[in-house]
Amino acid sequence: MIKKTRVAFLFDKRNNWISNFIKRDKFKRYNKKFSFNFFENKNKVKKFDIVFILGFTKILNKKFLQQNKLCLVIHESKLPLGRGFAPVQWQILKNKNKITVCLISINEKIDQGDIILKSIITFRGDELSDEIRFKQATASILLIKKFLKKFPHYILTKQKGKSTFYRRRNKFD
């Protein structure tokens, strides 16, 4: 029997909007090659081959990153522009209707990992929160599936150019 690649999805308990989309999809097409696990507690995520960290609002430390072979995150901006928090919301507030979605490796610095894959979300400008989240989830799932299809043959591309940073949003934004 061929050993399956162990995949974990880590969600933030307080920001787990994407977990329902991911769990609903189930990635059945990939079950022969991968085993999938879902977590909201980072302390339970150890010794995985791939960890997708989605909607997570906390910074993960070096110890966590070293416990797993490959940690990945989806970030919705044209990196290195727009590193940081709530990039979709900040860009919508700036009237951007095409937003880049990146699958990146994680290192110890916020959103500074190498880019693996990219796609684009297009907005009309009149979407409500649920529709925005649906488009984000759809783009994220497509990037994850594209990555899984290519794995272990993927290319890391360094981020280039001037960087900008989005601060955390608060109740006054």
Regions found by a protein language model. Name each.
Residues 1-173:
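One-carbon transfer enzymes
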